[in-house]
Amino acid sequence: MALYLRLPATAGFNIDNELIIINAFNANEPEQSLHGKDVNIIASGPSIQQLPLSELLDTPTIFVNGSISLIGQHQFTDIAGYVISDARFISHQPEILQQYYKGQPLYATLAVFEAMATTHPDIMRTYHHAMRVLYPVDRPWGVKSNKLSFNKLIFKKKLLNKKMPLSYFINNP
């Protein structure tokens, strides 16, 4: 018999004695869906220089980590979201987030939001309504990611170490 645990629907972060609540990603929320549209996912790296970005400006686009800085050079008209999967990005390049993040949908891991609560508390206070927690499905719960812990969760460690099969997420976004 398989034990399926429900992922938390929210995560709370204490910022200057104020509890900031960020909802988890939920594909059933209408504003979280692209309704079957094509989408570009642009990450940062040397190959970005070879992309014909002028041809992609009107297509819904998801930016990953530092690629959001491209909105300073190009007029993207349909920003579908911004994904930060690496908490080190927050501490190594804080100016990118400060300069280019203006409330676009932001999807990030708990480790990223923990880093942001320390380095960018004002951004979290202002835009938490546009932020969504992404839970990793490729590793057991409780495994440390980017050297930041999930210690703010109030779940028992025993429950957090259960792997969730991908098939679970078909009916339970």
Please give the residue ranges for each predicted region.
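N-terminal pre-catalytic "stem/leader" segment of glycosyltransferase-like enzymes
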Residues: 1-35, 44
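Acidic/Gly/His-enriched mid-domain segments of enzyme catalytic cores or analogous surface patches
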Residues: 59-60, 66-172
